[in-house]
Amino acid sequence: AEDPDGCCTLAIHAEDPEALAGLDAGKLNRVSLARRTFLKPWQEYTMNDRVQWCVAAVPAPSWAAKVFPELPVEEAVEKLWQVIFDVCRVSTGDPVTAWQEHVAKTKARRDQLNAWNLDHVHIVSSNGTDLTVGLADDATWEGASSKTDGGIEFIANVPTEEVFCAPHRERVNGTVYGTKPYVYNGQLIEGWHVTFKDGKVVEHGAKKNASLLAELLSTDENSNRI
C-alpha cells in the first residue's frame, strides 16, 4: 500500500531447515544482506509497531521430519500440527480466553522485572553457558502483546512466551552454548557456542557449519555484538 498506516501484515512460515544445505556460505550471506536491505521499509513499519503484524508457522514435511525423525513423514507432519495447536492454545477449546489469560500472566512477569530495576542478567546452565548481560541504560522489559501507534493491541508472535529487554552493547561477557540448532539461510548450525568480551564476540565455533556462523558474525561492523 502507498500508505501502510492502518494495515496489518501476517507472515506464515513453512520452512525447510536445510533447504540450502551445501551452498556457499558467503553467497548465502550476501543474499540475506540484500534481502534485508530490500525489506528495510517493511521492517521499519513492523519493528516499530506502526502496523499490526504477526508471524506464525505451519509444518513443512522437511521440518517435521527433523523434529520427529522416528516417524513416517505424513505422521510427523500431523504430530507437528498437533504440537503447534497445543503451544498456540488452539487445543484448549477456548483459544481467545486462553490467550487473554496468558497475556495477563506474561505482563505480570514483565511488570515484576521492571519493578526490580535490574542492572544485569546472569545466565548459567549445565551445558556450560555462563553469560552476564548488562542491560541498556533506562531499558524496560516488554513482552506478550504490543500496541500500534494508534493504540491497537496485538500479539506479534504466535506462540510467544518471552519477556525481553535491550542489552547494553558493551556490557556482555561470557560464553553461551546453544542447546538447539540454529537455522540460518536454509542451513543448520549445530553444536555452536559464542564468547563475548565487553559486548563483542571474541571466539566462536560450531560442530556443523562453523563457516556459516563465521559469515553471520562478520556480516557488518555490528553483527559480532549481541
Task: Outline where the language-model segments fall.
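Beta-strand elements of well-folded, non-transmembrane domains
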Residues: 180-182, 198
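Tryptophan-anchored aromatic micro-motifs
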Residues: 176-177
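Active-site and channel-lining beta-strand-loop segments
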Residues: 190-205
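Dual-mode signal for accessory low-complexity, basic/Gly-rich regions
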Residues: 203-226
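Short loop/turn motifs at secondary-structure junctions and domain boundaries
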Residues: 183-187
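Active-site bordering "gate/hinge" segments
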Residues: 1-173
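Solvent-exposed, flexible loop/coil residues
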Residues: 135, 167-168, 188, 193, ...
